[in-house]
Amino acid sequence: MSKQLAAQVPAEPVVLGKMGSSYGIRGWLRVFSSTEDAESIFDYQPWFIQKAGQWQQVQLESWKHHNQDLIIKLKGVDDRDAANLLTNCEIVVDSSQLPALEEGDYYWKDLMGCQVVTAEGYDLGKVIDMMETGSNDVLVIKANLKDAFGIKERLVPFLYGQVIKKVDLATRTIEVDWDPGF
């Protein structure tokens, strides 16, 4: 890895998508975007991938729609064999590229690992995942081992103001109005 590339390695990596199977014989790949608008993944450059524990920068040469898929052509990936080597690689950028959000909006990555407590002080557990349901996002919370209700996992809707009362990213705490029995 060159020194120039080492300086550009993402300080705070965030996954924006994943490369899928190869398409055709000229090095095109399917891409699965995790951005809210699938095409937004192309707004964030440069892309990085990790291969054998080493960061590598990849350059997007072109992209287009093919049926329901998005397909990409990366610079230097010119045949099916080269494309196959990138299948399942996550597409990573530095989080500093992401736009600032308004009050009450959060990136999922920022909520991961936050401790969730009720307004009464009951510790519900830690956020381990998020789900998109269509109507609202849902926190997936891993309950503490000695949970008084014997619950291992909780699903709490991320409804700011209704269920979510306060998010404090500095202390990594989310306060909720939620019955611990659920």
From Swiss-Prot:
GO cellular component term, pick one: ribosome
Top-rank taxon: Bacteria
GO MF, one annotated term: ribosome binding
Protein's cellular compartments: Cytoplasm
Residues in PRC barrel domain copies: 102-182
Keywords: Chaperone, Cytoplasm, Ribosome biogenesis, rRNA processing
Regions crossing the membrane: none
Main location (coarse class): cytoplasm
GO biological process, one term: ribosomal small subunit biogenesis
Cross-referenced PANTHER family: RIBOSOME MATURATION FACTOR RIMM
Annotated HAMAP family: Ribosome_mat_RimM
Function (record text): An accessory protein needed during the final step in the assembly of 30S ribosomal subunit, possibly for assembly of the head region. Essential for efficient processing of 16S rRNA. May be needed both before and after RbfA during the maturation of 16S rRNA. It has affinity for free ribosomal 30S subunits but not for 70S ribosomes.
Domain remarks: The PRC barrel domain binds ribosomal protein uS19.
Family to which this protein belongs: Belongs to the RimM family.
Subunit structure: Binds ribosomal protein uS19.
Name of the protein described by the UniProt record: Ribosome maturation factor RimM
Organism of origin: Salmonella gallinarum (strain 287/91 / NCTC 13346)
